[in-house]
A protein has these predicted regions:
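N-terminal module-boundary/linker segments of secreted carbohydrate-active enzymes
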Residues: 135-215, 220-231, 431-433, 483-492
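Alpha-helical scaffolding within the catalytic cores
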Residues: 190-199, 232-235, 307-311, 370-381, ...
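Aromatic- and acid-rich polysaccharide-binding/catalytic face
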Residues: 212, 376-399, 447
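C-terminal outer-membrane/trafficking sorting elements
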Residues: 504-565
Length: 565
């Protein structure tokens, strides 16, 4: 009888499993110079050598519309990136790491019910493809910390982080980057800035998030009157924006910390213009990533960090919070901070954070780690150093795909524990595509229209208007106002039902203090470390130390400090 039950269970399990369907390259359509190569040791009779061409797998069948996992069996002599297209629309780019033997790379694609075409098209080209496998996608919920990484963050920063977390996966915050400040009058309404006005002119709505740059705040000319005025105007906009309920988002195009060159690009990316050859690794002790505090590089770096921190402290005094994306596009070989190894970059990022937060006392910023797709894991400074993981993606004009493959790559890289944002873009990702593809970015932010910028114009009026008037896109008009917004902490942002059981710490914990003391049935909200970082709903598996167990009793929050032996 037991054997029969086990057999039935096995049959039921097998019947519910989703098996991958394989599509061979030799049966696909090749174009642009790609060619078939007959060979042994592969899945079928050969493989496709794409060179500078493309491959299209026709007849890819999906039983129902939705998200599917796509595995590509490939070879590449060097790192390459190429486009993934589904039924003619761009689904994102795929990074193919160098490999001398056949290897797999996995991505996602949204398919329609019935027959589909999946294509790999040239961006860099020069890969070989044996086959692809397609199977239903297994989604996992996000579990994001209830508090920002900054210890003792300001009330404004906690509100901002909570707002991002509360809306992530449900709604996307609209943004716009600012460029030229010459048309903006110091102290005027931020809505009068040309880039902010651009959005209103196109859509009748203002962006909820406005990008600002410390572009002229460092370097040998930082104290020139025009440069200083540029930064002062950016700070003025941040103050007015926050007062109006919006979100300031800061980028820092950091110029040579030794003040030798008024540049942040390295020579190969300067297009004949001024460039810097500053090498921040000269600030390390030889053979390590430990800083030599007596080195010129270290002293120059720290002086610049302190200077930018002072602007944040000015905002902090006025109750203003913001988003900070330092050392952006990490791994891209065009800025001086990306010319060295991932380990060295991570040390630099940690220095920026530690100096600002622990030394200068900056407590009002939400921190962003912004790598290239290929470096998201290898350049990571550590999850305790950032709240948001973001990527910059510039699709072709009028390509409003969700870029789901990049979203899922970053979700997986963060183990579903970070807010994911599109921190720079050209055309906006259409809200319907984002929700259909389960790739709902926290915010998007087209680069500026001033300084002859073309990026906001890469979205047609109809798409601009339909998105900015969609309830799933947050505009400035939709913002609640920071004085009215209240923080609602829950253990995670998953779509699963919360645990309402009465949870107790494990038997190896000792209660130290409880505030306030309230009698009644308690429901565990979460376990937090002493810096307020959410760790889960049980102390099981946690190392020795002090933890805060947060419970809800009669509608009130009760915090108990436990020591785990």
């Amino acid at each position: 009888m037991i054997k029969r039950k086990n057999f039935i269970i096995l049959i039921l399990a097998l019947s519910s499993m989703a098996f991958a369907t394989k599509y061979e390259a030799e049966a696909a359509t090749l174009s642009g110079g790609a060619k078939n190569v007959n060979a042994s040791g592969v899945s079928g009779t050969g493989y496709a050598d794409l060179q500078e061409g493309n491959i299209s797998f026709n007849g890819v069948t999906a039983e129902s519309a939705g998200k599917y996992q796509v595995t590509i069996h490939y070879k590449a002599g060097d790192f390459k990136a190429n486009y993934l297209k589904v039924n003619g629309a761009t689904a994102g780019t795929i990074d193919f790491n160098a490999t001398t033997s056949w290897a797999d790379v996995t991505t996602v694609a949204t398919l329609k019910a019935g027959t589909n075409t999946i294509s790999i098209e040239k961006y860099w080209g020069w890969i070989s493809v044996d086959y692809i496998e397609v199977e239903p996608y297994q989604s996992s919920p996000f579990k994001i910390s209830a508090t920002p990484v900054t210890p003792n963050a300001t009330e404004s920063a906690i509100k901002l982080y909570s707002f991002l977390r509360e809306n992530f996966g449900k709604k996307t915050i609209s943004g716009m980057m600012t460029g030229d400040m010459s048309g903006y009058t110091m102290g005027a309404d931020f809505k009068t800035h040309d880039d902010v006005k651009y959005t209103f002119t196109r859509t009748g709505k203002y962006p909820a998030l406005v990008g600002l740059d410390f572009l002229f705040a460092s370097g040998p000319k930082a104290n020139d009157s025009w440069n200083k005025e540029y930064t002062d105007k950016a700070i003025s906009i941040a103050k007015g924006l926050w007062k109006a309920g919006g979100i300031p988002a800061f980028t820092w195009h950091w110029k040579d910390p030794l003040d030798k060159k008024d540049a942040f690009y390295i020579q190969s990316a300067a297009n004949g213009g001024e460039y810097t050859d500053f090498d921040f690794s000269t600030g390390f002790k030889p053979g390590t990533t430990e800083w030599n505090t007596e080195s010129a590089a270290y002293k120059g770096i720290v002086a610049d960090i302190d200077h930018i921190a002072d602007y944040f402290l000015e905002l902090q005094k006025e109750g203003v919070a913001g988003i900070f994306r330092p050392l952006h596009e990490a791994g891209g070989k065009w800025f001086w901070w990306s010319i060295n190894s991932g380990e060295q970059f991570a040390a630099l990022y940690r220095l920026v954070y530690d100096r600002m937060v622990k030394v200068k006392g900056v407590k009002n910023m939400i921190w962003v780690y912004n790598p290239e797709g290929s470096t998201v894991t290898s350049w990571d400074p550590g999850s305790e150093y950032y709240d948001v993981l973001s990527i910059d993606i510039y699709n072709s004009a009028n390509d409003h795909s969700s870029n789901a493959s990049a979203f899922d790559k970053f979700k997986n890289a963060s183990k579903s524990t970070k807010i994911i944002a599109l921190s720079e873009n050209g055309p906006i990702p259409d809200v319907n595509n984002m929700h259909n593809d389960e790739a709902v970015w926290s915010w998007w932010m087209p680069w500026y229209s001033t300084w002859s910028g073309t990026w906001p114009g890469q979205t047609k009026d109809g798409v601009w208007k339909s998105n900015m008037n969609d309830e799933r896109i947050i505009t400035l008009e939709d913002m609640p106002g920071w004085d009215k917004y209240t923080v609602n902490i829950s253990p995670d942002t998953s779509t699963t039902k919360p645990d309402t059981s009465i949870s107790k710490p494990d038997t190896n914990t000792i209660s130290i203090a409880t505030m306030p003391r309230i009698a009644g049935i308690a429901t565990t909200v979460g376990i937090f470390d002493m810096n307020g970082h959410y760790l889960g709903i049980t102390t099981q598996g946690l190392p020795q130390g002090r933890y805060v167990v947060r419970k809800k009793v009669q509608g009130r929050i009760v915090n108990t400090v436990y020591f785990k032996k």
